[in-house]
Amino acid sequence: MEKTYGKTVLPLSRVKRIIKQDEDVHYCSNASALLISVATELFVEKLATEAYQLAKLQKRKGIRYRDVEDVVRKDDQFEFLSDLFSI
């Protein structure tokens, strides 16, 4: 996917709405929302890439729930997600 400065897949208005659901947040600038959106996209890309690598090892073309679960279990950087899975 080609990266363009200032563009994200996630709509900034929705990102800002999610951020503002935190009652401690009174204001969110467009730059902050953009940064959070880009970070979210990078996070999802990393998690999906790792899960896809596991699927490829099993000679599959698609990612399954179990692949994501295995990434969360095996990779310390995703440990904070372990409560979301039956690990």
Swiss-Prot record:
GO molecular function: nucleosome binding; protein heterodimerization activity
Pfam family, one: CBFD_NFYB_HMF
UniProt keyword terms in alphabetical order: DNA replication, Nucleus, Transcription, Transcription regulation
Signal peptide (residue range): none
GO BP of this protein: CMG complex assembly; DNA replication-dependent chromatin assembly; DNA strand elongation involved in mitotic DNA replication; DNA-templated DNA replication; heterochromatin formation; mitotic DNA replication initiation
GO CC terms: epsilon DNA polymerase complex; nuclear replication fork; nucleus
Superkingdom classification of source: Eukaryota
Location in the cell: Nucleus
InterPro entries recorded: CBFA_NFYB_domain, Histone-fold, Transcr_DNA_Rep_Reg
Reported consequences of knocking out the gene: Displays partial loss of silencing in otr region as well as significant loss of silencing in mating-type and telomere. Decreases H3K9 methylation more than 50%, whereas histone acetylation at the pericentromeric region is significantly increased. Results in partial dissociation of swi6 from heterochromatin.
Annotated function: As accessory component of the DNA polymerase epsilon (DNA polymerase II) participates in chromosomal DNA replication. It is required during synthesis of the leading and lagging DNA strands at the replication fork and binds at/or near replication origins and moves along DNA with the replication fork. It has 3'-5' proofreading exonuclease activity that correct errors arising during DNA replication. It is also involved in DNA synthesis during DNA repair.
The protein's assembly and partners: DNA polymerase epsilon is a heterotetramer consisting of cdc20/Pol2, dpb2, dpb3, and dpb4. Also forms a heterodimer consisting dpb3 and dpb4. Interacts directly with cdc20/pol2 and dpb4.
Annotated protein name in UniProt: DNA polymerase epsilon subunit C
Lineage of origin: Eukaryota, Fungi, Dikarya, Ascomycota, Taphrinomycotina
